[in-house]
C-alpha cells in the first residue's frame, strides 16, 4: 500500500518523520510524506523528511513561532493557506498513492485545528481515502 503521510504540527511531523525513517531502512519506498507546521523550529528538528517537504504556514500571522495551543488560530491559518498545502501535496505526486494519512497531536494548536480543514479539502479534491491519526 502506498501512503501519503501529512504530519501536521509538532507531534504529527515527528511521527511522520519516523514513518519515513522506517521506510528508508526497509528500502520499501511505500511512503511519501510532508510536514506542515506554523513553527519553524519544529520543522527544522525533523531528520528524515526533506527540506522541500517541510511546509511552513502562517508566517504573516505568527511569524514562524507557532500558534501555541490555539486550535482556532491553527484552523484559520490552515484555511487561509490551504491552496499552498494542496499545491505542495500535488507537487510530490499523488497519481500512485492508495491513501492519505493525516497525523496530528490533539493537544496543540496547529495539528488539532488545521487537520480537519485539510481532511475536508483532501476529500473534496481526491478519490483516495483520507485517514486521520491523532
What are these regions (language model features)?
Residues 1-134:
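Tubulin/FtsZ superfamily GTPase core signature
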Amino acid at each position: 500500500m502506498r501512503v501519503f503521510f501529512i504530519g501536521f504540527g509538532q507531534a504529527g511531523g515527528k511521527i511522520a518523520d519516523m514513518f519515513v525513517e522506517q521506510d528508508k531502512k526497509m528500502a520499501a519506498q511505500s511512503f511519501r510524506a510532508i510536514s506542515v507546521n506554523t513553527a519553524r523550529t519544529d520543522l527544522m528538528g525533523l531528520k528524515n523528511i526533506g527540506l522541500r517537504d517541510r511546509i511552513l504556514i502562517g508566517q504573516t500571522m505568527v511569524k514562524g513561532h507557532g500558534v501555541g495551543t490555539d486550535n482556532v488560530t491553527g484552523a484559520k491559518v490552515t484555511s487561509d493557506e490551504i491552496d499552498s498545502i494542496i499545491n505542495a501535496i500535488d507537487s510530490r505526486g499523488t497519481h500512485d498513492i492508495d491513501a492519505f494519512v493525516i497525523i496530528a497531536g490533539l493537544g496543540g494548536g496547529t495539528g488539532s485545528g488545521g487537520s480537519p480543514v485539510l481532511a475536508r479539502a483532501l476529500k473534496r479534491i481526491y478519490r483516495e481515502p483520507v485517514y486521520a491519526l491523532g
